[in-house]
Design a protein with these regions (language model features):
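Glycine-rich phosphate/adenylate-binding loop and adjacent beta-alpha elements
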Residues: 1-26
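Short, glycine/polar-rich helix-capping loops at beta-to-alpha or helix-loop-helix junctions
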Residues: 14-15, 90-98, 163-170
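Mid-domain Rossmann-like dinucleotide-binding core that forms the NAD(H)/NADP(H) cofactor-binding site
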Residues: 33-111
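Glycine-rich helix-loop-beta junction characteristic of Rossmann-like nucleotide cofactor-binding loops
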Residues: 52-57, 125-126, 147
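Glycine-rich phosphate-binding loop and adjacent beta-alpha segment
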Residues: 83, 101, 139-184
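Helix N-cap at the beta1-alpha1 junction of Rossmann-like dinucleotide-binding domains, i.e.
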Residues: 92-94, 111-113, 139, 162-163
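Short amphipathic alpha-helix with an adjacent loop that forms part of the alpha/beta core around
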Residues: 113-127
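N-terminal Rossmann-like NAD(P) cofactor-binding module of classical short-chain dehydrogenase/reductase
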Residues: 130-133, 156
Length: 184
């Protein structure tokens, strides 16, 4: 999103009984759709956009950072895309169990020691990952995951709130800008 704004994140009103919203931002729920279905439309659309950006190919290995609602939706979409393996990494046992029931591999994340799951990822994917999708908005976690990608690997971020901490070093950012300029 170019101008991220969300009630309860960076706009007050998430717990208000009533809230005033611009009419352009309000949509009627069709009679054929339940409230529960309508409630996840925004999350599902962001996840579909992320899958489009990743452009998963048959036989690829993809890692999802985070097992919140977006991570769980993404895992299912990517599993259906034909990727060789989809692995979700999170810290909540109940969510990891749910993903396992959907046929998705999982890695238990240790928020106090990222090297634990980093070693597990390297063991499972010794040649690196084709793509990583970040749903955590954790600069520390994301910065450690770049080295887990294969050459030409892709990383997509769909954080639930803006990240204000730079993840890339100035040198890495300069190199990315040079590569982008060369390719365009």
């Amino acid at each position: 999103c170019d101008h991220f704004g969300s009630l309860g994140h960076n706009i007050n009103g998430g717990f208000a009984e009533y809230v005033l919203v611009d009419k352009e931002k309000v949509f009627a729920i069709p009679d054929s759709m339940s409230f529960n279905e309508a409630a996840i439309i925004e999350s599902v659309s962001c996840c579909i956009h992320a899958v489009d950006m990743i452009h998963p190919a048959c036989g690829e290995n993809i890692l999802i950072l985070g097992t919140g609602s977006n991570g769980i939706i993404l895992a299912q979409l990517l599993k259906a895309s034909g990727a060789l393996s989809v692995t979700a990494m999170g810290s909540k046992d109940a969510k990891l169990k749910l993903l396992n029931e959907y046929g998705i591999d999982t890695i238990k994340m240790d928020r106090n020691d990222y090297s634990v799951h980093e070693a597990e990822i390297k063991k499972r994917f010794p040649h690196g990952l084709d793509a990583i999708v970040d749903t955590t908005a954790s600069p520390e976690l994301v910065s450690k995951c770049f080295k887990l990608l294969k050459k030409g690997g892709r990383m997509v971020h769909i954080p639930s709130a803006p990240v204000f901490h730079p993840v890339l070093s100035q040198a890495s950012l300069f190199l990315l800008l040079q590569i982008s300029e060369f390719l365009s």
